[in-house]
Amino acid sequence: MKRIVKRIFLSLPIIGLIGVSSCKKKGEFPIEPVIKYSNFVITGDSAKLYFTFTDGDGDIGLAKSDTGFDFFIKYFELQNGNWKEIILPAPFNYRMPEVNKSGKKKAFQGEVIIDIAPTYSNPFSNFDTLRYEFYIKDKALHESNHETTPDYSIIAPQ
């Protein structure tokens, strides 16, 4: 378990923020961030979550000196036909890098790829159907809408 937690914390900074642009003019997006699920890809014992975002004032991401989190994932298991949120010992909270370092209010949109590693499921569970709900907060603590990954099944190692 110690090794798993160590690998999770080492993986936290591995966040790809690509395709960030400011093609839209200021005021075309609300100041609250808006996210949209794009894809969820499982590769071995880890996974990648892809989503897009817009933010009207560009205060997305945290400076290296900030100590909090701005990306939050809730983990759910399908238990006896009902979705149940499971609080894991090491939560899947992440830090997105600052996209607008100028400090000027400016609309941004982009795509984010989050590496969820090494274990994207609950190793202590007998349930095999999972999904994630995720959201972000900007520097002003505006919370985005919540998005959900599709349901997926895992196969326990034999």
Task: Go through each PLM region and give its residues.
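Bacterial signal peptide processing site
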Residues: 24-26
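First exposed extracellular module after export/assembly in secreted or surface-exposed proteins
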Residues: 32-158
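Bacterial N-terminal signal peptides that target proteins for export
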Residues: 2-10
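C-terminal motif of bacterial Sec signal peptides marking the signal peptidase cleavage site
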Residues: 19-22
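Hydrophobic alpha-helical targeting segments used for export or membrane insertion
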Residues: 10-17
